[in-house]
């Protein structure tokens, strides 16, 4: 597997565009269009929040009940959530606009939104935006970057990644763009992720691969513990790489799934590290668990602990907060068997052994915790299972960003 420069247009046959449709103020980019030159098989995973935004319902219908998809229209600034039948109707009108502009079936258009909940989409601006973006569609690196910028809300930077693999003597590319900074606690973040590949793979196996990698990538991210109404991961495959079609769990499927995992893991870490107001990516690994479920529960409990996140912001080795978060997670373990380490580019330091603090240097601990990526590793010595979750520190700016969000 090779990481390459690129984003959503890295794979053969995919084009993208981004621009300002007037949804946001002051001419900020707020709309993106992704298009495949040929129809794609599509897969998706979606929010588990009972309150589902209209685009989520639309996309579930397309992904689960239609054979192909060919375009994605995404706006930022308004979530189109809690908007009733009118909001769902606007998804249909968005698809109609894209269908007319691109000469593709209406039911091959996927729709996504992110932003303020409760406002109706300005459908005239969306329709005009599609017309504006259509002639700008391109397979260039610049087009991909512009599209990635257009789906941002409180993100501080666009999030893109691409990889290449060899399957059946053919080069297969997977590219992606995503957004997410606040309201990040998926259980499948607001999190939107769009992945495009030229792999030749059946719809069934594409969905299987996505469903298998999401639990250990996006579902292991938390910025603030809030699960969005709009969480969506969409994966399109157009087959233009020309590899033998993947129709079963063979070696080709394994290679593809590993690459898909790497793309989504990288994007999950991008989201966590760009949490609203964040100054550090906080990674938590649980080792020695009896089961994967136990390890996941413990890691997520630590990553969502506000007190622990605040300590990371303060570069404070307050290990008691980590042990406390593990203790109220609901997972059973013996606290007197826990070893805990802090690690970063500045070094690695054992903080507790068998549940008791060792004689460590607070100065060294502070140095380690002052890096932009910090890892806490807890070994509970009960088995062989492990899990890793990603979050960020909790800063003053998080409160300021969210207090001022609608203004």
Model features per residue range: what roles?
Residues 1-75, 79-92, 99-407:
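A structural signal for small-residue-enriched, beta-sheet-centric alpha/beta enzyme cores
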């Amino acid at each position: 597997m090779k990481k390459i420069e690129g984003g959503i247009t890295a794979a053969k046959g995919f084009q993208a565009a981004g621009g300002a449709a007037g949804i946001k103020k002051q001419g900020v980019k707020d709309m993106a269009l992704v298009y495949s030159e040929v129809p794609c098989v599509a897969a998706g995973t979606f929010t588990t929040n009972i309150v589902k935004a209209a685009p989520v319902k639309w996309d579930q219908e397309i992904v689960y009940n239609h054979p192909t998809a060919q375009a994605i229209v995404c706006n930022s600034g308004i979530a189109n959530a809690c908007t009733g039948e009118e909001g769902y109707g606007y998804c249909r009108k968005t698809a109609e606009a894209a269908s007319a502009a691109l000469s593709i079936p209406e039911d091959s258009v996927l729709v996504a939104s992110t932003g303020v909940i409760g406002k109706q989409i300005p459908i005239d601006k969306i329709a005009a935006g599609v017309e504006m973006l259509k002639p700008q569609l391109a397979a260039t690196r610049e087009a991909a970057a512009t599209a990635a910028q257009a789906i941002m809300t409180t993100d501080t930077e666009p999030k893109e990644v691409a990889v290449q693999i060899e399957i059946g003597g053919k080069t297969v590319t997977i590219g992606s763009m995503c957004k997410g900074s606040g309201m990040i606690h998926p259980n499948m973040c607001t999190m939107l992720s769009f992945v495009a590949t030229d792999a030749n793979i059946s719809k069934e196996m594409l969905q299987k691969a996505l469903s298998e990698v999401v639990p250990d990538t996006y579902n292991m991210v938390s910025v603030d513990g809030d699960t969005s109404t709009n969480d969506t991961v969409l994966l399109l495959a157009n087959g233009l790489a020309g590899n033998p079609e993947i129709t079963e769990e063979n070696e080709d499927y394994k290679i593809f799934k590993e690459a898909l995992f790497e793309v989504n893991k990288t994007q999950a870490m991008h989201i966590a590290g760009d949490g609203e107001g964040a100054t550090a990516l906080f990674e938590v690994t649980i080792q020695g668990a009896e089961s994967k479920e136990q390890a996941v529960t413990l890691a997520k409990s630590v990553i969502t602990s506000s007190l622990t996140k605040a300590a990371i912001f303060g570069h404070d080795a307050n290990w008691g907060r980590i042990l406390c978060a593990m203790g109220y997670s609901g997972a059973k373990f013996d606290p007197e068997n826990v070893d805990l380490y802090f690690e970063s580019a500045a070094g690695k330091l054992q903080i507790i052994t068998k549940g008791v603090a060792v004689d460590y240097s607070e100065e060294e601990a502070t140095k380690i915790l002052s890096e932009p990526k910090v890892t806490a590793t807890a070994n509970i010595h009960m088995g062989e299972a492990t899990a890793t979750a990603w979050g960020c520190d909790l800063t003053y700016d998080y409160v300021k960003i969210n207090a001022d969000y609608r203004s």
